[in-house]
Amino acid sequence: TAKGFSNQCATLRAVALAADYKEIEVETKRLDDCDLGPVGFIKIDVEGHEKAVLDGAHETLARDLPNLLIEIEEKHTARPLEESIAEVEALGYRGLCLRGGVLGSAERYLRERAEASERGAPAPLYIYNFIFVPQ
């Protein structure tokens, strides 16, 4: 059961809010425990809890190899973007992202971002939605 979290400010973290809000309890369960038929696509937008979702979906991912769209932001995960992407790719996926309407590899985006940082140049376009397709 998740309790004491808020979606005010687009987060599931317990935060102090100036606005009034109420708490509700919701049942949580692993995706692997949902007795689903074949799964072709999964959208994950859980404000830093991506690892927990993936950990609870290993059987589903291995069985169905669904395409994934995952919002990953370092400010929510408190870990390097490279680690989060590598974790999904280790499950047999290839990471992709859209930049200017063009689909490209997440690996290239990460490389260009690191190179810009090393040069002290502005980072490439900020990307937080990543597409993962089975390899």
Task: List PLM regions with ranges.
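Active-site beta-loop-alpha junctions enriched in small/polar residues
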Residues: 73-75, 101
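Binuclear metal-ion centers of metallo-dependent hydrolases, dominated by the metallo-beta-lactamase
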Residues: 81-135
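Proline-aspartate-enriched helix->loop->beta-strand connector
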Residues: 65-70
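Short internal loop-to-helix segment that lines adenine-nucleotide cofactor pockets
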Residues: 3-64, 75-83, 87
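Extended, compositionally biased low-complexity polar/Lys-Gly-rich tracts
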Residues: 1, 24-26, 128-134
